[in-house]
Structure formats: structure tokens, C-alpha cells
Amino acid sequence: MIDRYKHQQLRIGLVSPQQISAWATKKIPNGEIVGEVTKPYTFHYKTNKPEKDGLFCERIFGPIKSGICACGNYRVIGDEKEDPKFCEQCGVEFVDSRIRRYQMGYIKLTCPVTHVWYLKRLPSYIANLLDKPLKELEGLVYCDFSFARPITKKPTFLRLRGSFEYEIQSWKYSIPLFFTTQGFDIFRNREISTGAGAIREQLADLDLRIIIENSLVEWKQLGEEGPTGNEWEDRKIVRRKDFLVRRMELAKHFIRTNIEPEWMVLCLLPVLPPELRPIIQIEGGKLMSSDINELYRRVIYRNNTLTDLLTTSRSTPGELVMCQEKLVQEAVDTLLDNGIRGQPMRDGHNKVYKSFSDVIEGKEGRFRETLLGKRVDYSGRSVIVVGPSLSLHRCGLPREIAIELFQTFVIRGLIRQHLASNIGVAKSQIREKKPIVWEILQEVMQGHPVLLNRAPTLHRLGIQSFQPILVEGRTICLHPLVCKGFNADFDGDQMAVHVPLSLEAQAEARLLMFSHMNLLSPAIGDPISVPTQDMLIGLYVLTSGTRRGICANRYNPCNRKNDKNEKLYETNYKYMKEPFFCNSYDAIGAYRQKRINLDSPLWLRWQLDQRVIASREVPIEVHYESFGNYHEIYAHYLIVRSVKKETFCIYIRTTAGHISFYREIEEAIQGFSQACSYDT
């Protein structure tokens, strides 16, 4: 369907019997209305042609071959001069055979049938609206018991007997005996109701607004009572309140979408277009049919049997009619969702039939495999690896993938620059991988974002746009900070690459979908671009350090190699002296020269105006020099003072990893501040 904004969309929900009839029926030029499937047959075994009014009828679903009717006559499609537009003998219209992909039919059910999705699936919508136990409703649907209709004010048989209680077994089994007597049809139809028809009557009598009001009043009363002191009773109250909330939400949804509750009980059963449930001829002349065809045949057989029982014989036992209605209900249940009521239906080879639910749900269903997961043009797929040198909004595309995705744009660039005379010459240059091809590819990629998608796409951050750059290898490089939005890691995960073609798609990718514009979670507002997994381990290793305490800074005669910052294995003093550095650049330079390790503790001189020591902490040790100056050594810093107790300088105890991490954070903050100043 197409909404008012011209967006194509698909909506799955309840529809009225009138809407089903409008979808499935059509009026042929002679005025006859067709669409009802009344026969369970598919193809005639002799002529190999579809049976009339069967599951593949050409009158209902359209011709198998375009412009050719069931009689074999041919008409030119779209030729207004050709008259008539349908065959008067077989009633088949001369139209395109593609109509068999979307033209539906319907089965007129003799008795109402509940939709098993709304009865058996949890939560049961029918049970929620009627506020009755699911077990009781199932017994009513499958004709295990009946209920009395509160009809007229006249003294009826059941009123004289009292209200009907199905728990009384003798009374329950005595009712069918009256049905076997001729003339009790009026009594049966007037005073009791069973099967899906009983559910339909109760749903039709519901007033959704009154349901909302009554549920709200009851919810408030339960909230005012407070805890009873009995844990079991308190749990029952909580469950009841949750149920009332679900019931109100369901009623509001029905009102908002203009859906009537009785539509959950089917009177007309839609029949899928035949091209969606085909019969294919394989080698040896054998036929391979879709399971749905067999399930449809089962429904039609049982429905026709029930029709014969009600029309051909006036003295049919009522119990037999009820059993046949139950069989029709079970056949429709199997068609919609095989196995939902217990053991699934199997064929002669003990293979479970695939019902309508099996066709559309799951990874191999119609939606995820054919509609959502189908292969599209201008897309690729590869394994992702970490790209720590990338910017947040960039991704690395392998040359092999990039040249295929942007081949059309590269061909246009070669022709525009007069480097190729036609498309064939341009493709040959691309196959030869000439240097000019990579230069044009770089220019094209600079102005064209790509979309990365990791399945399953559970929220909008599952698809984000990036600025691609060429990388060597055959894997896609990704910044590790964007992994949380994709729920991805680098243990073999794959991602799909898509190229937005239209200007609208490119604008949306640049303005809304770039990774550096999606830093917060759309669900809860928390930061989504946070370090995870590999980055957390790297930050831990970078800032862990070797915890040796201040004893390594002591001077002792046995530690002869302290000035070289080396370990001494020949004595018990195994640790080296912690070096002093005037600034962070000297410390990083010493690390790059491999004079210290990444986790080696060191003393870094800190500016006095940047750090104020106002702690009352007592120094662990005090080292005095020959001129009277002394060092106050604390757990994480060191203060150099003069004889007059003036502070010369302060050293903090850190590692080269801490310094490197601090400088990265400082540069990021400075860059952010500059960007904010430019904006203002």
C-alpha cells in the first residue's frame, strides 16, 4: 500500500469480510462475479489444465499464458479493437499472466472460524478482550461445550432449566440428544451457541470504550487497596493490574486503527495467488506442489462436507454437525499455523506440512529472506577488521569491492576525461587496473558516502553511513568506537556495503546517518560511541603499569645499574630506579628509543600552576640532599622543597602509557574546543 506521503509500505493486520471480498472478487465483462473457490481440485489429470472453480482456476486467478484463455484462443493484450476482452466459452479474460501473482480468491466458510493467531498465540487477544480464561474459550471454539444465549424475555427451555452450566456432565451430554430429533433446529439456533460463532457473538457485543472505562476503574481500585500482607494475594493483584493495562492498550489499538473485534473470527478465508503456491513439474513427469495447496484442499473438503450436512439432510444429528465444524476449525488452524495446537500435520512421508506461518516467519521466511534479506545491486559483503588509524566517520573499503561498487561512476569519469571512447574501452581499462582508474576511483569515493549494515538490523544504528577510503586486502576496516551501535566485534563478523544512488539517499546519508552524528542511543540517550572489547583491553594494558611502590627509588650500593633503568637479576634488588623527566615529550621520546617500557613507572615534572597540592597526607619518605634540599615522597607524587620549605617543583608518579593516553585526550578536548569556538 502507499500512504499520503507516497511511501510504499506493508501492513499486516485484521480486515473486514467486505475487504476480503473486495480483494478476491472481480467482475468479468459479461457481468458475472467470480472469486470464490469451491472445489478442492488443482489440475485435470488428462488435460493438465486447471480445474474450473478450483485452486488454480483461470477464471478466478487469470490465464496461465498471457492472452491465451483456457480454450486455447488468443487475443492481443491491450488492443482495444479486439472484442470481446474475454472468452465467452470459458470466461477467462485476455490479460497478462502476471495477474496470477497478485489476484486472490476466497473460500466462503459454512461456519465461522476463529483466527488461531489471535486465539492461541500469547498473549491471546480474544481472551484479553473477553476477559475469560483461554482454556474456556478453546473448549467453546472446538465445540467441547456451549453457552446459552440471553435472547428474549419469553420462557425458553433453557430458562426453565436454569442457566446452562457446562460443568454438569449429564446436562452437557443430554443437549445433543435433543438435536437428533427433527424439528429442534429452531431450538438449537435460538437458545444455544457453540463454536467460533459463539466467540463472534461475544466479540460483536463488546463496547471498546466501556471496556477501557471499566478496566481503568478496576485498576484504580486495586491500586488504592495496597498490599494485603499475603504474598500470594499480592502477586494475583499485580498480575490482574498488568492484565488490565494490556486490555486497555489492546482496546485503544482497536479504536485507533478502526478494527472491529469480531474480525478475529473469519467468515471468508483468503486464498493466496497461485504463483505464490506453485505446482512445478520435475523430471520424470512428476509434480511438486507447495504444501499450502494441500492444506487448502483439506479446508475445502471439510467445508464442503459441512455444507452437504446442513443442506442435503434435514435430520442430521446435531453432534455430527458440531464435530464437522470442529474439523473445519482444525483445518483452518493447520493452514494458518501448523502445530500450534500440538502435534503438527504430516504428509505420507512423515514430513511436516509448511503452513502459512512457516512460509513468512523465521530466517528463511518470505520477509527476511525475500523482502528484507534479498540481494540488491550496488552492494557487497565482507568480513570486518579493526582500523585504529581511521577517523570515526571513515571506513576502509578493499580495492576489489570498491571498484565493483563504483564501476559505473568510474566508467563515466573515464569517458568524461576522454580517457575512454565508450563503455567497452572503459571496462577493459578497469580490468587491466591501470593507475588512472584508481585515481578516478579516489575522486569518486571522496564525494560519495556508503552505507554499512550488520544483520540483524534491530534499530536504526544498525545501518550507518561512512566516508570510504581505499585499503589493501579483502576486509572492511572499521573504527572500533562504532561497534556498539552495530553490536559487532572483530571475531569474524560480516557487514554489507550499500551505495546510495539517488540524491535524496545521499543527502540522508550525509545529514542523518553519518557515524559521527549518531553518538547517542536513540532509545535511552546514553552515549553509544564508547570503548568496548578490544579498546577496553587496550586501554587497560596502556594504563595498567607495574606496581612496585616507592622502594624502587631508593639509592643503595648494590644497585649499580640504576642509572640505566635496567633490572638486576644477580641480587635480591630486582627492580630498577624510576627515572625523572621534565616533560611528557622526553618521556615519550625515551619510550620510542626503548629506554623505558610502556608500563615502566616514572616521575614526571608537573607545572605548579596546574596542580595544587592541598592534601594533609603525611609523606611516606623524605630524602635529604647535601645542600639541604629534600624530597617529600608520597604514594603518587613527589615534592622537591628547599631549606626554607619553598616548593621547587612537583613530580607525579605515572607511566609512559598514562602519558600517551592523557595526550590523546588533551588533543581531543582541544580540537573540540576549537570546533565550538568556530561555531560561535
Curated annotation (Swiss-Prot):
Entry EC no(s):
2.7.7.6
Task: Specify where it is mainly localized.
Answer: plastid
Q: Which reaction does it catalyse?
A: RNA(n) + a ribonucleoside 5'-triphosphate = RNA(n+1) + diphosphate
Q: Which cofactor does it need?
A: Mg(2+); Zn(2+)
Q: Which GO terms describe its molecular function?
A: DNA binding; DNA-directed RNA polymerase activity; magnesium ion binding; zinc ion binding
Q: Which SUPFAM superfamilies match?
A: beta and beta-prime subunits of DNA dependent RNA-polymerase (SSF64484)
Localisation per UniProt entry: Plastid, Chloroplast
Q: Where do the annotations place Mg(2+) binding?
A: 489, 491, 493
Question: For this protein, what does the record note about how its cofactor is bound?
Answer: Binds 1 Mg(2+) ion per subunit. Binds 1 Zn(2+) ion per subunit.
Q: Which UniProt keywords apply?
A: Chloroplast, DNA-directed RNA polymerase, Magnesium, Metal-binding, Nucleotidyltransferase, Plastid, Transcription, Transferase, Zinc
What processes in GO biological process is this protein linked to? Answer: DNA-templated transcription
Q: What is a single cellular component term in the Gene Ontology annotation?
A: mitochondrion
Domain of life according to the entry? Eukaryota
Say which family it is in: Belongs to the RNA polymerase beta' chain family. RpoC1 subfamily.
Q: How does it assemble?
A: In plastids the minimal PEP RNA polymerase catalytic core is composed of four subunits: alpha, beta, beta', and beta''. When a (nuclear-encoded) sigma factor is associated with the core the holoenzyme is formed, which can initiate transcription.
Protein name per the record: DNA-directed RNA polymerase subunit beta'
The major lineage groups are:
Eukaryota, Viridiplantae, Streptophyta, Embryophyta, Tracheophyta
